[in-house]
Amino acid sequence: VPDAQSQWAELLLATLAEAGIRDAIISPGSRSTPLVWAACQIPSLRRHALIDERSAGFFALGQARVTGAPSLLICTSGTAPSHYYPAVIEARQSGLPLLVLSADRPFELQDCGASQTIDQAHLFGGYARYFELGTPVAERAAVLGLQRMAWQAVAAALEAPRGAVHLNFRAKKPLEPASLITSEVTPVLRPARSGYRWRPAPPTQVSPEDLAELTERWTQSRCPLLVCGALSLQDSPSAELVARFARLSGAIVCAESVSQLRFQLDPSTADVAICDSYDWLLGSPQWSKQVAPDLVLQLGAPPLSAQLGRLLEDTPGLELWVCAETGWPDPLLQSARITRACPTELLLALCRALEARSPAVPSTAQRLWRDAGTRVRQLVDAQLGRAFGEPEAVSRICSRVPAGSLLVLGNSLPPRLVDRYCPAAARRLRVLSQRGTSGIEGLIAGALGAASQAQCPTTLLCGDISFLHDVGSLWAARSEHTHVPATGWPLVIVVINNGGGRIFDQLPMAKQAGDHQRFWTTPHALDLRGAAALYEVGYSRASDRETLRIALESAYARTDVSIVEVVVDADSARARLSAVAAEVDTYLRGVLSAS
């Protein structure tokens, strides 16, 4: 049927938009022409152009981390969609909705040496739901099927467990719509229906049996901990609810920065034990033995802190409960129970149950954790004031991130340094991280995608190797390609340049590797201003407290993308870690001997 293919594509894109798709990230190619042209006909669809599919994939995930909704990726055939694979895996592991719409060659060109043709069916294996869209047919049943698959794809991306969905569109030549050549085009494919009524399932409620048992355990515990690991903006409970639960239960709250709670909770709140120094406290063997918890409730992903991990693994008699709507976030295999519930719903139910009982009386353990945590934070701050290095740089950067803004943390050292050196504070920061697979790929692209939706200043804090790994994603910073600069808000990319991947210097292998250590740390002597010049974004360099202050003030005064390169000594993080740990251990030994 003449022009049926273009009308098929237009109907598909219109239905996806009706189902809630608001952003399309398009990578160039010929076979995807019907899809791209169709996307350009929908006024409600914001279109972004990225030449690299890997960057496009993580740009879409950055948007999803902020909005909770899937964005649409469009690409040509062949190896093009395979570059989405890392983002598709991250979507599955992080529970992020994502739609991939790949163009493909028709069936008759498969397995015969046709150019740019591979087997794209089920390309992403078990990491994505798959829909074969077939070829255009001018029949009502076929049109109904196409519209149903579009709605079903969006629903599948949003239903638990959230993740990626792959739609495969087989296009034949001519790829251009007939309307570009002649005005005499007869509509042959009309919508068979519109307005599907679909809504995601409500949050999972805790079972009465789990609630009764956990309430009983909590009231009997002498030293309960609430551990908050990585949580999305959509899944994290409010700071007010966590504080209410801590007050009612006597829980000691240990919140990682990526939980959304570390920079939302107020540590000065009366009758609430918020300990932001847990990583230092648990680094002391004596503390871990004498003031160890007997009950831990974990919200979100497993904790990033190695000290918390060792506590969960090595403490005799410790009972671990894990709250998870889907998945099995217990890599140490230590949990007594995986309770299927939304974190907010679980805490609300526990609060109601605990309110019916006698109020919790602050225990000796709770007072020790709170008082020691406060003093340890003072010791850490004093150490930071002695010399400028990576820990102090991270602390000062976080303190200057505007209140109420978005902070994107890279992987490797940055999130660990933030948790060690940045105190909890009620600054209303939203914190994004790529903790699904904990890889360094796509960090710049993800931050740019998040910034396109955030409607506030955005800061990416990452290491130099992470930056170099994704430097091509700075293409998305150009206003003619995406909507990022048009937001009018600054995106500040802060790069800690310590000359390589220094987290590997903290591993046991570093002592034996000798000259072979370069295969882990990948040292370099690059100046990052060249990258800024290539992509025409702002740039400044800092190497001490004053130049860092000036660089950040200048970057946040802009309304576009800029890079702040912070040059630090390669060994500063490891050296400061050893010095602070020794001082903290000495202090805690005194506290424990006195108690």
Region roles according to the model:
Residues 1-4, 311-415, 543-554, 558-595:
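Phosphate/pyrophosphate-binding active-site segments
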Residues 4-90:
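N-terminal cofactor/phosphate-binding cores enriched in small/glycine residues
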Residues 9-20, 27-31, 35-39, 370-455:
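Active-site diphosphate/adenylate-binding microenvironment
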Residues 22-26, 46-48, 66-105, 292-300, ...:
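A short, small-residue-rich loop immediately preceding and capping a beta-strand
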Residues 83, 228-320, 425-455, 468-472, ...:
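Glycine-rich, anion-gripping cofactor-binding loops and their flanking helix/strand elements
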Residues 101, 108-121, 417, 423-595:
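Thiamine diphosphate
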Residues 102-153, 255-372, 556, 565:
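Glycine-rich, acidic loop regions that bind phosphate or pyrophosphate groups
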Residues 149-152, 156-220:
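Conformationally flexible catalytic loops at phosphate/diphosphate-handling active centers
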